[in-house]
Regions:
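An extracytoplasmic/periplasmic, membrane-proximal ligand-sensing/linker region
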Residues: 206-229
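C-terminal non-catalytic accessory extensions
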Residues: 222-246
Length: 246
């Protein structure tokens, strides 16, 4: 099915439908999405598969557990960057693809059964890596102009997320992620310069393939909190999108 899709749609990164390996009728991911603030989620995660995601769709990025691409595509984008340990290496790879006009696709006809973060689960180490690596993506993949435009709203999101980290007793990990970014600033700057030289698409074009919402996994909070957070982030994201496009 990947080969058939490639014959039709051409160059790109292709993701299958990920299903849980222990509950084979439950979706793990029907396409991975990036929020304008670099927050990510898996479309359809935790839902019973009744064919609601049996589509072919342009997505923000493909899951690292299984991505299909041609040799030429991989050569253009380059290797996975080792600066991303365990998390967001796939986010970065898909984003870098978009910078080079290489899209990401979800092909539901291909199915892979996947454990899904069995090592760290929702541990403090995972939160640390997710936050640190999210900021590496933001600082290196957005242009400086875009970062300046959305910085005030990014700051609001960060302050809001502090409450979540305090609730989950992971504030220390959040603070550690900031200090880790500071330690990596030289590498981040070098990486950004390299990416800026090769990028083809502007951020205005890139964010067309990003989303505004961010539904927190119910496994980490309750439904009411998830809906409230999603509403606030969606509003801020839409405003950021307007600023980027201005």
């Amino acid at each position: 099915n990947f080969l058939s899709s490639y014959d039709i749609h051409g160059e790109g990164l292709y993701q299958p439908k990920f299903m849980e390996i222990e509950r084979k009728n439950v979706i793990n991911s029907a396409g991975n999405m990036i929020n304008v603030f670099g927050l990510t989620y898996l479309r359809g995660r935790g839902e019973i598969d009744s064919g609601q995601f049996n589509d072919f769709k342009i997505i923000s990025y493909t899951g690292g557990a299984c991505t299909f691409a041609s040799k030429d595509t991989i050569k253009k984008i380059g290797n996975v960057d080792p600066i991303f340990f365990a998390y967001h290496d796939d986010v970065d790879y898909g984003w870098r693809g978009w910078l080079l006009e290489i899209p990401s696709y979800y092909e539901s006809k291909s199915i892979v059964y996947h454990y899904g973060s069995p090592t760290l689960n929702w541990s403090s180490k995972k939160f640390f890596l997710l936050e640190r690596n999210r900021w590496i993506c933001l600082l290196t993949l957005y242009s400086r102009t875009t970062l300046l435009k959305i910085f005030p709203l990014l700051l609001i999101v960060e302050i809001g997320m502090l409450g979540f980290f305090i609730e989950k007793r992971m504030l220390v990990m959040k603070i550690k992620s900031f200090f880790s970014i500071i330690k990596l600033l030289r590498k981040i700057d070098k990486r950004k310069k390299k990416i800026d030289k090769s990028r083809i698409l502007s951020d205005k074009k890139i964010i067309i393939n990003f989303v505004d919402d961010f539904p927190l996994p119910i496994s980490t909070t309750n439904l009411k909190t998830s809906q409230k957070v999603n509403s606030v982030i969606t509003s801020l994201s839409k405003l950021s999108r307007k600023l980027i496009n201005y």
